[in-house]
A protein has these predicted regions:
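Core motif of extracellular immunoglobulin-like domains
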Residues: 64, 82, 137-139, 181, ...
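Extracellular/luminal immunoglobulin-like beta-sandwich modules
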Residues: 29-31, 70-78, 140-158
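N-terminal V-set
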Residues: 70-109, 192-193, 290
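Ligand-binding face of N-terminal immunoglobulin V-set domains in extracellular IgSF glycoproteins
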Residues: 109-152
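An exposed tryptophan-centered "aromatic clamp" motif
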Residues: 193-241, 291-337
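N-terminal Sec-dependent signal peptide, specifically the hydrophobic helical h-region
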Residues: 2-52
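Extracellular disulfide-stabilized recognition modules
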Residues: 157-175, 205-206, 225-270, 320-329
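Conserved hydrophobic ligand-interaction patch in extracellular adhesion modules
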Residues: 174-201, 263-264, 272-304
């Protein structure tokens, strides 16, 4: 690939992994839940209102407590089940407990356990949180024919980044968009994440796939070339599109880095292949697009020099805008492929 005429260096990710796990209950992560005791003797479940927040690599507790009439029920016959809501009527098994028996499922094996902080505590501890853990979880407590459920939303600190590959804009169907985000250290963003990014000022005039199969884009500054100047600000929604035959960009989401992005200064211009080798020689690898965005947003990486990133594009992160440094707004500048 031809190097950028202005000269490039390489943006890197350290090979050494930095510890980012949070202690359970630390930093205000754990919410206190008070249980409402009913008079009927039926199982009553209460979870935390709103959401709990962590970051990739952290440890989080999904709060859930239950109450029931001990005289009417054997504690060993109480079944506790955690599932993740993947679609409006679709669920993924996460963790089940019955008496002393415990079982975790799929990617949650080895990372989940009950908190068991006293009687009636069904709270679930998730360690080494991944991007894929984001979403809504259902806590279900069952005793024979009596049961109750509660819902907990797990949110992640992170950053949205719009993405299209070398082939250009509007070239990705839904599954290709999912893959593109994964390859750049992200996942497809949710509507809630995109809406929050819009509230924080994200303005992007190209529609992209979201996690639920809808296509949307955020507008903070209406203009003629972007859906007309007289239309209101907001997240514009094309609705649910055909996942195989229709093509758009992608809105990806990524979170905390297990490492550090830094700029490797070189004495001359580098081609992409030379940048890859320079990173390798330095004990690292060329940063992915999502890693660069995370370094900009979370680690406040600010560099007014462009460098290669993993997909073959040339970018640079700006936290403090200044003269002759890519405009008046902070962000990750893209000089193209």
């Amino acid at each position: 690939m031809r190097p950028w005429a202005g000269g490039t260096a390489a943006l890197l990710v350290l090979a050494g992994v930095l510890s980012s796990a949070a202690l359970p209950g630390a930093g205000g992560r754990k919410k206190v839940v008070h249980v409402l005791e009913g008079d009927s003797g039926a199982v009553v479940v209460q979870t935390a209102p709103g959401k709990v927040v962590t970051h990739r690599g952290g440890t989080i507790i999904l709060p859930c407590r239950y109450h029931y009439d001990v005289a009417a029920h054997d504690p060993d016959e109480i079944r506790l089940k955690w599932t993740k809501v993947t679609e409006p009527m679709a669920f993924e098994d996460v963790f089940v407990a019955l008496g002393a028996a415990r079982r975790a499922f799929g990617s949650y094996r080895g990372r989940t356990a009950l908190q068991e902080d006293g009687f009636g505590d069904a709270s679930l501890v998730i360690r080494n949180v991944t991007l894929q853990d984001y979403g809504r979880y259902e806590c279900e407590v069952t005793d024979e024919l009596e049961d109750d459920t509660g819902m907990v939303k797990l949110d992640l600190e992170g950053v949205i980044f719009p993405y299209h590959p070398r082939l250009g804009r509007y070239t990705l169907n839904f599954r290709e968009a999912q893959q593109a985000c994964r390859e750049q250290d992200g996942i497809l963003a949710s509507h809630d994440q995109l809406h929050q990014a819009w509230l924080e000022g994200l303005d992007w005039c190209n529609a992209g796939w979201l996690q639920d199969g809808s296509v949307q884009y955020p507008i903070s500054r209406p203009r003629e070339q972007c859906g007309r100047k007289d239309t209101p600000v907001g997240v514009r929604n094309y609705g649910y599109r055909h996942k195989d035959s229709e093509h758009y960009d992608a809105f990806c989401f990524t979170s905390n880095l297990n490492g550090k992005v830094y700029f490797l200064k070189t004495f001359r211009k580098l081609s992409y292949a030379e940048a890859v080798q320079a990173c390798k020689d330095n004990g690292a690898a060329v940063a992915k697009v999502g890693q660069l965005y995370a370094a900009w947003k979370i680690q406040l990486l600010d560099r007014c020099e462009a460098g290669w990133v993993e997909d073959g594009s040339i970018r640079y992160p700006i936290v403090n805008p200044r003269a002759r440094c890519g405009g008046r707004e902070p962000g990750v500048r893209n000089l193209g492929f």
